[in-house]
Amino acid sequence: MVAMIRDGVRSQARRDMTDEVAHRYQALLAGRDATAEDWLETQLRRVRDREDDLPEDPNLLPQWAENHAAQVAHDHAHYLRQRREGAPRRYFATRAQALWFLQQVAPTKAVDGAWLHGTLRHWRDPRYHGLIRTFLEELGDGDPRCNHVLIYQRLLSRLGCLQGLPLEPSRFVQGAVQLALGQHCERFLPEVIGYNLGYEQPPLHLLITTHELAELGIDAHYFQLHVTIDNAASGHARRSLESLRMLAPVDDEDFYGRVRHGYRLNDLGLDTPSLIASFDLQGELLAALERKRVFGQFMHSDRCRLQGRTINQWLAKSGAMAGFLEALQVQGWIKRDSDPTQSRFWSLIDGPGAAMFGVFSAYEKQLWHDWIAGSWQGAGPRRVSPGQWEQALALQAEAPGRAQASEIATLIEAMAGNRHAEPAGLRATRDYIAATGLFQGGPR
C-alpha cells in the first residue's frame, strides 16, 4: 500500500510538472516568466549526464557535421529506394495522421528561431552576426512570404487545423526551452550556441516528412524550406559551426562542456518518429467525439435511434462513443473498409447540403474518412509539390525598413516570442535590418 501511495504521488508530481510547462510556455510567449532562468537550469541538470554524439575535441566538429550530413543523405537514398520498390510510407499511414502530427508540433513551430532572439542586441559585434543572420532568416527578414511562423500558420489554416487540438503538456517543452534560451542569452550563451548547433543539423525525419506530406496532398513548403536553408554546405548548419568557432574562448573546456549541455536540450520531449508512431486513429476519433458529445446533447430529434437508444441518450453519457461507433456499423450507417462515400453517415457530414454540415472540423472529418476507409485504398489525394500553395498567394514584398540605432531596443522587443509574425513585428524586423546594416546581399 505504501508503495502504491508513493507511486501515486510520483505520478501526480509528473503530471503537475508537465502541466506546469504548458503554462510556462504561454508565460514565456507573453514575456512574463520571472522564473525562466531557474527552470532552464533545471532542464540543463536533466540532460547534464546524458550521452551525445558530439566529438570530445571541438576542432573535430566540421568533420562531425560532414559525417552527419553524409549519413542522412545515405539513409534518405535508402528510404527512396525502398519506396520505389513498393514500400509504404514510413511515417504517415493516413492523411489524418499527418494532420494530427502538424498540430502536435505547432507549439514549437510557433516560436521558430526564438532561442536566438537574445543575440539581436549584439549587432555591433561581428562575432554574433552569424547567429543574428540565422534568426533574421527564420523571421524571413520581415517578409510575410518568408517568415517561418507565418508559413506554418498559413499551412494550418489551409488545412482547417488553425483552431488546434488539446495537447499533452509535454508538447510545449521544446517551445518553452527555445523561448527561455532566447530571453536569457547573456547567461546561457554557450547553451544557446549548443542548442543552435543541434537544431540546425538537418535530420532524416525532415526529408521523409517533406516527401510524405507532398504525397498526401499537403504543401510541405515549411519542411522543404528547412531542408534547403539548413544545409550543411552553406546554410544554417554550417553557420552554427562558424558561430561556435568565433564565440568560444580558446581552449576553454568548460565553455565547450556547456555547449554540449545546450546541444542535449534538443533531446527533451518525444522525438519526431516516436511522436508520429504514437498516433491512434480510432483513439483520436473517439476523443474528438467525446469533445463534441457535450455540445451535441439534446440537439437531436428523438426519432433518431440506434439500437433502441436515441442519439441524445448516446451522447448523454461519457465513455459511450465506442459503442456509438459500433451501433452505426451494426445498423448500416457506416460500412468500414469501403469507400466512405458509400456510407450513409458520410453523406450526413460531408458537402454543403449535408444535414450536419459544419458540425465537424476539417481534421475531424479526415478522422471519420480514414477510419471508415480502413483497408480500402482509393485514388488518394493529388500530390502537392512543396511551395505550390504558397506560390498562389497574393502576398507582396514589403517596403524596406527605416529606423535609427537609438530605436533598436524597441525593435528587438517587437521581434520577441512570435510577435515578429504580426504586421508590427514584420515591420520591426525590416527596421532592425535597416538600422543595423545586417542586410543579406543578393545577385545584381
Segments from the language model and where they lie:
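Non-heme di-metal
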Residues: 1-444
